[in-house]
């Protein structure tokens, strides 16, 4: 008799950054959080393809802003269009136009933000908060009002 794998508790967290050292650093730091599987990507287009195949398994996407092929804000917008419950964090070392950024936060496309460099303790704290928010949103779909 074959062994069945339970995937119902599989909660994926994507890290999307074209700088491989950043995605590896974040992956290693977030391994400490129980109940999630970290999936690093260095190409936002590949991240989007993977996300679209198993969108309901993703609970959080952390993305850099400036990347070749597809910027982080557009990537997160496409992901939110596909799965409204997924939580998103944008990070950048650059300035972002206030009107564009406020539009994305107002429409809940971006749930969290980091200015690089990111302290690992801040990253872990924010990820835990976003995971908690995800669980609340899935349990109470009208939250927040």
Describe the function of each predicted region:
Residues 40-60:
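Acidic, metal-coordinating helix/loop segments flanking the phosphotransfer/catalytic sites
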Residues 67:
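Receiver (REC) domain active-site loop signature in two-component systems and cognate sites
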Residues 74, 95-112, 121, 125:
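Alpha4 helix (beta4-alpha4-beta5 surface) of REC/receiver domains from two-component response regulators
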Residues 118-127, 131, 135, 139:
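C-terminal output helix
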Residues 49, 73-85:
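Short amphipathic alpha-helix used as the core "switch/output" element in two-component signaling
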Residues 64:
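Active-site residues of response regulator receiver
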Residues 20-39:
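Two-component/phosphorelay signaling modules centered on CheY-like receiver
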Residues 91-93:
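Hydrophobic/aromatic residues positioned on beta-strands within the core alpha/beta folds
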